[in-house]
Amino acid sequence: MPLSYPHFRKLLLLDDEAGPLEEELPRLADEGLNRRVAEDLNLQLPNVSIPWTHKVGNFTGLYSSTVPAFNPNWLTPSFPDIHLHQDMISKCEQFVGPLTKNELRRLKLVMPARFYPKHTKYFLLEKGIKPYYPDQAVNHYFQTRHYLHTLWKAGILYKRETTRSASFCGSQYSWEQELQHGSTSLNDKKGHGTESFCAQSTGLLARPSAGSAIQSKFQQSRLGLQHKQGQLANGKQGRSGRLRSRVHTPTRWPAGVEPSGTGCFNNLASRSASCFHQSAVREEANPSLSTSKRHTSSGHAVELNSLPPSSVGSQGKGTVFSCWWLQFRNTEPCSDYCLSHIINLLEDWGPCYEHGEHHIRTPRTPARVTGGVFLVDKNPHNTTESRLVVDFSQFSRGTTQVSWPKFAVPNLQSLTNLLSSNLSWLSLDVSAAFYHLPLHPAAMPHLLVGSSGLPRYVARLSSTSRIHDHQHGTMQNLHSSCSRNLYVSLLLLFQTLGRKLHLYSHPIILGFRKIPMGVGLSPFLLAQFTSAICSVVRRAFPHCLAFSYMDDLVLGAKSVQHLESLYTAVTNFLLSVGIHLNTAKTKRWGYNLHFMGYVIGSWGTLPQDHIVHKIKDCFRKVPVNRPIDWKVCQSIVGLLGFAAPFTQCGYPALMPLYACITAKQAFVFSPTYKAFLCKQYMNLYPVARQRPGLCQVFADATPTGWGLAIGHQRMRGTFVAPLPIHTAELLAACFARSRSGAILIGTDNSVVLSRKYTSFPWLLGCAANWILRGTSFVYVPSALNPADEPSRGRLGLYRPLLRLPFQPTTGRTSLYADSPSVPSHLPDRVHFASPLHVAWRPP
């Protein structure tokens, strides 16, 4: 007969009718009983042929393909002019006085941040924008390209101009070395020569459609300038096959010519006369061409002609355009859906390329990307705006893996000890928090994103319209991209983007100027930065509380009026150092703070309502007596694990699920086990703040017996059979709690001190979690433990009670602790203010 739920509750001692604890509790440690209960509840599932369930509610498991939803009406979020002031440290010192070593160390980490991995893989530009939405490829391309352009305009990205220079918008930092008079001087000994930088150059193309013929004729690679064929010439490829294996994509493409999939180099002898003809036509039409000289590494000086931006797009009909987009203007439409119909909608499509306000030196940056990008909804509650996802996963796996620094995440008890109080609370919203922290330009070559341009992107997605080297630039190849889908997509995009369609159709390479979200270093840096800022605020206003985790920043004060004045002062301080706050999203919580998924009040901590609703919904949909895929179990455990500390039996109740996930087996919920879990999560108990106190109750055990010291009283007992020492120590602690009711118990066992009961026999772990709920433990060495003698059966010998004070810990979360306004004179060997010694004490 299967075990019913009432019997199971009684077995776990969750009912008041249970017998003496000293007799009942050791029984739960029996392996045979645990095995029989597991079999009754079907917790050890044999391999069965019943098909697994791969979906429970919103949780999906193995073999499930979730099709991402693309929103063609996504809005690109706007980014404020984010510029963290370089003199932030001096401004903080004006605000609060000399900074502590902890604060200085953290602020220096991000001014600027550095990221130099040992190995970096570079990918072709075609992988710059991921084909995440195959049915909406063109829409996704332009929306992503618009997002990248917005980030560049906001000063968050660098734009690669040449191999060793980049441009950006916004305010400049001192570590960003400006190019002197438009030239980058490189070391000739290394074979680089001197590279003359012209304002119209770009990461891939030296100039749009109206560039000079000389520039079209020569193509630069790492081997110097290579001669190139004319736009419509039919010469041979020359040495392209031999060079391609080494160079892949040239450092700079000729003016306006879209690079093909592999690049194309040509022999000096195979150049066409059409280049010289174009040169003559353009020089007649544009007398304002400016000329600059380029010295190559091979010693040749080549004149490069560059145009003022105003002359772009205003060429005569006789000109042969080398810009893929503008070439359609001079061709006959191939069909009703020819792209030439769209190109002829405007006379002036604007420049092929834009350049930033500042041009700086960079380390050698190849014409490649190191990560792909795609768009998703901003969050589950905001599907109108998009969010850019950057995939730099190469730094988290394989040979290019980087070991990220670890940092403190406040656990539930530390958070409760720190924030559970009778203060009034509000939370601040930092706009684009990650994009506040500047990166050193030397990190740019490792964090490259970009796009290959529309023709190559479309060609990659369409097998019928691939651009081949031998037909590159021919009219037949030009119209091979024309299709109804592309035509309709571009026509719709033209209504929103207008002439930016032309700009976005060109290739671009961008490097991060601020820390990106897709790299494991970024959360660490953000946590260090916000903790240092909160430390400064705490010391400036010692009667208040400022706390942060990542970009969540909360302020607490004793009254609402006090909180409002604090809010004004802190907001002004944050704005003065360049931190942008979204004041519209400031939330005032009253006395119950909502933070990190918890509600924290003077009574303790509970999970937020939306998490409780999710749990109820999960239990409604969990099937009984059906094997559930272990991947689905992972999602269920993730949800239930968050709220486990608020239940009677805690994490031990979930151990059968953990075991099935570890074994990668399916799990079957029996009616009794599901009812047990359901009841556990329907009644949640708050986690209370620990109080300081003096330990008066001690417990100790040997494999055969237990002993207690409660004040001046001593007790002892024996076990029916010898038990493992950790199990015996846990039983002794449970007896001490049940007999004395004390919430402060001294023990010499580290496993009991850790309060993790998942390694004990399952039934014992569940029962002990409920008995010891809310109990704090203090470590006492065995030699000084007053319960040591009773546990060995000797009651006659009395050891005096220790004066053992307990101080609640806030872990390593108290980095913003009360600190002296000037550094104290510590011994020379102490180089930092330990957070353990300067911990903030709750009011």
From Swiss-Prot:
Q: What is its EC number?
A: 2.7.7.7, 2.7.7.49, 3.1.26.4
Residue ranges of region Terminal protein domain (TP)? 1-177
Q: How is its activity regulated?
A: Activated by host HSP70 and HSP40 in vitro to be able to bind the epsilon loop of the pgRNA. Because deletion of the RNase H region renders the protein partly chaperone-independent, the chaperones may be needed indirectly to relieve occlusion of the RNA-binding site by this domain. Inhibited by several reverse-transcriptase inhibitors: Lamivudine, Adefovir and Entecavir.
Site-annotated residues for Priming of reverse-transcription by covalently linking the first nucleotide of the (-)DNA: 63
GO biological-process terms attached to the record: DNA replication; symbiont-mediated suppression of host innate immune response
Q: Where is the composition biased (Basic residues)?
A: 239-249
Q: Check the record and name the PROSITE patterns matching this protein.
A: RT_POL
GO MF annotation, one? RNA-DNA hybrid ribonuclease activity
Please give the residue ranges the record annotates as the region Disordered.
228-255, 284-314
Bridged cysteine pairs (disulfide): none
Chain residues that bind Mg(2+)? 429, 551-552
**One Pfam family per UniProt:** RVT_1
Query: Looking at the record, which segments are called Spacer?
Result: 178-346
Gene3D superfamilies, per database record: 3.30.70.270
Q: What else is known?
A: Hepadnaviral virions contain probably just one P protein molecule per particle.
According to its UniProt entry, the function of this protein is described as:
Multifunctional enzyme that converts the viral RNA genome into dsDNA in viral cytoplasmic capsids. This enzyme displays a DNA polymerase activity that can copy either DNA or RNA templates, and a ribonuclease H (RNase H) activity that cleaves the RNA strand of RNA-DNA heteroduplexes in a partially processive 3'- to 5'-endonucleasic mode. Neo-synthesized pregenomic RNA (pgRNA) are encapsidated together with the P protein, and reverse-transcribed inside the nucleocapsid.
Query: Into which family does the record put it?
Result: Belongs to the hepadnaviridae P protein family.
Annotated domain remarks? Terminal protein domain (TP) is hepadnavirus-specific. Spacer domain is highly variable and separates the TP and RT domains. Polymerase/reverse-transcriptase domain (RT) and ribonuclease H domain (RH) are similar to retrovirus reverse transcriptase/RNase H. The polymerase/reverse transcriptase (RT) and ribonuclease H (RH) domains are structured in five subdomains: finger, palm, thumb, connection and RNase H. Within the palm subdomain, the 'primer grip' region is thought to be involved in the positioning of the primer terminus for accommodating the incoming nucleotide. The RH domain stabilizes the association of RT with primer-template.
Please state what the protein is called. Protein P
Record the organism. Answer: Hepatitis B virus genotype F2 subtype adw4q (isolate Senegal/9203) (HBV-F)
What is the taxonomic lineage of the source species? Viruses, Riboviria, Pararnavirae, Artverviricota, Revtraviricetes
